[in-house]
Amino acid sequence: LICYVSRDGKTATCPPQGKCEKYAVSASHTXHXFYVYGCTSXC
């Protein structure tokens, strides 16, 4: 799964037992930047 977090770094979407790990930064066509996270399972 992929998590998209806005520039404020406060809004992440992950499963309840998931953990977001940042691995890239992308930009949308509207020129707004987003952090790209990979959701990994966690205990």
From Swiss-Prot:
InterPro entries, per database record: Snake_toxin-like_sf
Cell compartments where the protein resides: Secreted
Gene Ontology cellular component list: extracellular region
Sorted UniProt keywords: Acetylcholine receptor inhibiting toxin, Disulfide bond, Ion channel impairing toxin, Neurotoxin, Postsynaptic neurotoxin, Secreted, Toxin
Disulfide bonds: C3-C20, C14-C39
Main location: secreted
Alphabetized Gene3D superfamilies for the sequence: CD59
Regions annotated as coiled coil: none
Tissue specificity: Expressed by the venom gland.
Gene Ontology molecular function: acetylcholine receptor inhibitor activity; ion channel regulator activity; toxin activity
Similarity comment: family membership: Belongs to the three-finger toxin family. Short-chain subfamily.
Record function comment: Neurotoxin. Blocks muscular nicotinic acetylcholine receptors (nAChR).
Protein name stated in the entry: Venom protein E2
Species of provenance: Micrurus pyrrhocryptus (Coral snake)
